[in-house]
A protein has these predicted regions:
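Conserved, well-structured core domains of diverse proteins
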Residues: 1-128, 138-142
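Long, contiguous bundles of hydrophobic transmembrane helices that form the permeation core
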Residues: 2-44, 332-439, 542-645, 675-684
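Hydrophobic mid-bilayer segments of alpha-helices in multi-pass membrane transport proteins
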Residues: 49-54, 74-88, 104-113, 138-147, ...
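Membrane-water interface regions at transmembrane-helix termini and the short interhelical loops
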Residues: 63-67, 89-100, 125-126, 144-158, ...
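Membrane-interfacial loop-to-helix junctions in multi-pass transporters
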Residues: 135-139, 200-213, 239-253, 284-290, ...
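Core transmembrane alpha-helical segments of multi-pass membrane transporters/permeases
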Residues: 150-151, 155, 165-180, 188-192, ...
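Transmembrane alpha-helix interface/packing and boundary motifs in multi-pass membrane proteins
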Residues: 221-225, 256-265, 297-303, 454, ...
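Hydrophobic transmembrane alpha-helices that form the pore/transport pathway of multi-pass ion
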Residues: 234-302, 308-315, 321, 498-530, ...
């Protein structure tokens, strides 16, 4: 009987999943995600790229385990591997053929690698003549920076490239700029040597993080991907929420929150999990624009989801000098509120459209699934345990990698014992190494560009200038400063992976908020939130565009829907700046609970206002024809009142909470009474 049920479950899931084969899925991912648009070499070229990738991973593991390589040499070697592989694997444009390797890409890859190996070979002499660089040093630096920009154009995209280029222009043109942007300007030699050879430039904190724990977490993610944890998470979420109203959308929210925290890229997560969840949502009855928006908003939210936050949590702990566990605790409540807001909106949309869930008898059962495949989450449990125990990110990642390998080989032993073909072996390890080496390329290049931005900030003092400028423009008013910081962070965050996003926004914009007496942790979280939300905010909205492409929907309409779904991310940061107890800073358990309850009520009110649907979708007015109620638009005044009640609830003041909760209760009571009078069926 159980076997029949599992068979029915599998048959039903196959019906609602996309019908495209694996090759079609790969093609879609290559079109939507720059990181997946790599060449697939054959024969000799394949062996060469595989060999370089494996050597790269072995070098990284050796450097991490031995600690015998100095920081600058490690970072330069890391960049040399990245630049070589970038041009061997990624074609010049999206439309370039992926089955050929032009001679000029080989040359560019070798030149890029040679520029960084120049530092490795001449490290001692470069240290001795620091500040007195030769013309050759300058020439190598110029070429290295230009090649880095070209690889950024190919793989990461134009937004971060344009931003970094603008900062370099700022360094040269300072004496021609007005107001707080004015500075004396710097020579070509000074700018190039500061960016290329200094640990405050390209080889600064971003690449330092990338060449150590970020690389290890990407390797860990590649191992998890090979074990099939993505499908496991989707199955678990289907078991938990698939049968609820609008089940597939809720599955998308839950699974993207779980997967997104590890991925480090909202676009990659949208493409990866969206290729399954978006067709499920459309099959159930959601419009394409809404289905793509749900996945984009949820995947973007995964980057602010503890415990890993796309590796930004470790960078934040290092930047602020705080324990990692403090960062995780601070991120918990905002993340809960963000996903609660999306969940409520998804539920209301399902009710408005009259969408049911997937038949429960045809969905996987939670406990049997957990007993059969629960071992897959063991590596994540290991990482979280060691991080919470106060171990370093590097140590925790290494333990997670070891746990992944042990689980993989354990499954293979079980396969052999039952006469099956082993599902994990030497070939899989090589594939995992190649995947990790390929996936680190975009992150490393983005971190290099972030290093350029941070390098110009440290050279010119732009961080202080911009902070003072924002405060001056806001006339010292906190609210206006927050608004200006929000806009600046969204612009700076466009197209940047999570780690680079945090480093750029926290370096440039967070200082303005801190200067007004706000907790540094709250200021950094504020800047980071809005940098991340750039992925669903028009006009760039890369995650929303990826979701729209999978859903075959209009990109701008999808981006607008994603922004509506992610409305919590535009409200929550203001809440924790004005009330740091939300970040569990000097907060009692009771105060945190009160904040969560009132904020969830507030998110409900705002979601009802945005959706135009609540306990009763006919608003103040309704029509009847032949004894049947005709559904008409939610009344504008009612929507405004729900929005006001919601905003009052999220404002962190006791008086506004009381007024907001009272108004919300009155509106809900009115809708319930109206529904009872009409004899309408319950909708929530």
């Amino acid at each position: 009987m159980a076997n029949d049920k599992n068979k029915n479950s599998n048959d039903y899931i196959e019906q609602i999943l996309p019908t495209s084969n694996e090759e079609e899925m790969k093609r879609m991912m290559k079109e939507l995600d720059r990181e997946q648009s790599y060449r697939e070499h054959k024969c000799c070229r394949q062996y060469i790229t595989v060999f370089i990738s494996v050597i790269f991973v072995i070098f990284q593991l050796y450097a991490t385990l031995s600690g015998a390589i100095t920081a600058q040499v490690l970072r330069a070697t890391h960049l040399a591997f990245v630049q070589l592989l970038a041009f061997l694997l990624f074609p010049p444009t999206k439309n370039s053929p992926r089955n050929t390797l032009p001679w000029y890409d080989i040359v560019l890859g070798l030149i890029g690698a040679a520029c960084w190996l120049y530092i490795v070979v001449n490290f001692d002499s470069l240290v001795r003549r620091s500040g007195n660089n030769t013309p050759l040093d300058v020439a190598v630096g110029i070429v290295g920076i230009l090649v880095l920009f070209e690889s950024c154009r190919r793989i990461v995209g134009l937004p971060i490239m344009i931003i970094a280029g603008s900062f370099i222009v700022f360094a040269f043109a300072g004496k021609y700029l007005p107001g707080f942007l004015h500075h004396r300007g710097y020579s070509l030699q000074r700018v190039v040597c500061h960016l290329f050879y200094n640990t405050e430039g390209i080889m600064g904190t971003p690449i330092g993080a990338c060449s150590t724990f970020i690389f290890l977490f990407i390797l860990f993610g590649a191992l998890l991907e090979k074990t099939g944890i993505g499908h496991f998470f989707i199955d678990v979420c289907n078991a938990l929420a698939g049968g609820a109203s609008g089940g597939p959308a809720k599955v998308a929210v839950l699974s993207s929150a779980l997967l997104g925290t590890v991925s480090g890229s909202s676009v990659s997560n949208t493409v990866g999990s969206g290729s399954f969840t978006i067709p499920m949502m459309k099959k159930l009855g959601y419009k394409g624009e809404f289905a793509g928006a749900v996945e984009a908003a949820a995947s973007t939210g995964g980057q602010i989801m503890p415990p890993i936050m796309g590796a930004a949590a470790f960078l934040m702990a290092e930047s602020l000098g705080l324990p990692y566990i403090t960062i995780v605790k601070a991120a918990i409540v905002p993340a809960i509120l963000y996903f609660t807001g999306i969940f409520i909106t998804v539920h209301l949309e399902a009710k408005k459209l009259g969408l049911k869930g997937l038949p429960k008898e045809q969905l996987p059962r939670f406990m049997p699934l957990l007993l059969k495949k629960g071992y897959m989450i063991l590596p994540l449990v290991v990482i979280i345990y060691f991080l919470c125990a106060g171990k370093t990110a590097v140590f925790a990642a290494l333990m997670g990698i070891i746990a992944c390998v042990l689980v993989g080989f354990g499954v293979s032993v079980s396969d052999l014992a039952h006469g099956r073909k082993p599902s994990f072996g030497g070939k899989d390890i090589v594939e995992i190494m190649c995947t990790a080496a390929r996936n680190i390329i975009s992150v490393a290049i983005a971190c290099g560009m972030a290093g350029i931005i941070i390098g110009i900030v440290t050279l010119t003092g732009l961080g202080l200038r911009l902070g003072n400028g924002l405060v001056m423009l806001a006339h010292g008013k906190l609210l206006l400063t927050l608004v200006f910081t929000m806009v600046a962070s969204i612009i700076l965050g466009m197209g940047a992976p999570t780690t680079a996003n945090y480093l750029i926004t926290s370096t440039i914009t967070a200082g303005a908020i801190i200067s007004l007496g706000i907790e540094p942790l709250a200021a950094h979280m504020f800047a980071f939130y809005f940098g991340i939300i750039a992925d669903v905010t028009p006009p760039v909205a890369l995650a929303a565009i990826a979701g729209a492409a999978i859903a075959k929907a209009k990109p701008m309409k999808t981006a607008i829907n994603a922004t509506k779904l992610a409305i919590g991310a535009f409200i929550i940061p203001y809440m924790f700046v004005y009330n740091s107890k939300m970040l569990m800073i000097n907060a009692s358990a009771l105060s945190v609970v009160m904040i969560i309850v009132t904020a969830i009520l507030g998110m409900f009110g705002i979601s009802v206002a945005l959706e135009g649907y609540g306990f009763n979708n006919t608003g103040f007015f309704y029509n009847s024809r032949k004894g049947k109620t005709t559904i008409i638009a939610f009344d504008a005044l009612e929507r405004i009142l729900f929005a006001v009640a919601g905003l009052l609830c999220v404002i962190p003041e006791a008086k506004t909470d009381i007024i907001g909760v009272s108004l919300l209760a009155a509106l809900i009571a009115y809708q319930l009474i109206l529904k009872k009078v009409r004899g309408a069926k319950a909708t929530v």
